Amino acid sequence: LGNIDAMPYMYSGADHFMAVWSSDLGDEIKEAAGEASGFKLMGGAYRGPRVVTATKKMETIDDFKGFKLRVPNLEVYLKTWQWLNTSPTPLAMNEVYTALQQNTVEGQENPFADSLNYSFDEVCKYWIKTNHVYSCNLFMMDRTYFNSLPEEIQNAVIEAAEYAGQEISAVQKQRDQEAEQKVLDEGCEVIEVDTKAFADYFDTFA
């Protein structure tokens, strides 16, 4: 599911993301991934779009060439940023702050609120709204145990997960808005890029 969810520019925005994960298609994805992993996957909570925080200003696709970016150690993330001609570097999150201080990397990418939680506003002046990935958090239960429950309990669990996902999504949207305002108040620069140009650039990415 991590590789599916991490495909760049799969969603046009938050509304599209929520529409997919609350649709029959979203249910099919959860069922297929859950069956393969031995879990019952339920709900769907918005994590916010991933943005790039950087030590230097970047506004266009060309600006990313050679950019030293920390990425999660997942194949799809590495290929995404290689496609953009950056220099992706897998690092554990607890190493990223120091790596940014020492210029081992020049940036990292995560949702706004998550990036602020790691205090990247202290080492990254530029926050670039690439919005390249919208991530989904799901509720999981052991599939065998779930299937052993009475049908009415199964339905109640699914309903609770759906409700919780909607509530978490609303809170996350608010957290991202507050985080963006906080970094602006602290003197960081939030850069709006042409996300359509980026999405078009990834049109043949697979």
Feature map (PLM): residue ranges:
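N-terminal secretory/targeting leader peptides
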Residues: 1-16, 25-27, 31-206
